């Protein structure tokens, strides 16, 4: 986001007026803005750390990343420090190795889930 981008700009002495996450991602993926690439790389690393913490807190077997801008840069995420940071939990790294990580790319997962739940409920009602 803009705060992370501002921190990278300050650290590198660069400044470009990119404030929207979508603009930062576009500039990073197009490769013409080094600070945008560094910002996106930092975002992926932080996301990996947070996702690893959440997986441990909840005893997850799968981590689902949904919504936002992540579906736009899955290849970048795969080549980033995301997984390294996800696993960097000391003695818990072995457990996290077995945790599946998925990015939901469907544009309406909430509606899809609601439709599936409704279908299941209707099937149960019909079976009675």
List PLM regions with ranges.
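ATP-binding/phosphotransfer module of carbohydrate and carboxylate kinases, centering on a glycine-rich
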Residues: 1-128
């Amino acid at each position: 986001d803009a705060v992370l981008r501002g921190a990278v700009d300050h650290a590198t002495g660069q400044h470009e007026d990119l404030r929207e996450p979508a603009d930062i991602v576009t500039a990073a993926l197009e490769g013409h803005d080094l600070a945008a690439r560094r910002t996106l790389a930092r975002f992926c690393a932080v996301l990996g750390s947070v996702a690893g913490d959440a997986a441990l807190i909840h005893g997850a077997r799968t981590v689902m990343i949904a919504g936002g801008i992540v579906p736009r840069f899955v290849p970048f995420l795969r080549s980033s420090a995301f997984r390294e940071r996800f696993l960097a939990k000391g003695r818990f790294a072995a457990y996290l190795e077995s945790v599946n990580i998925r990015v939901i790319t469907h544009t309406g997962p909430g509606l899809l889930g609601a439709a599936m739940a409704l279908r299941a409920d209707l099937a149960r009602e019909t079976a009675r």
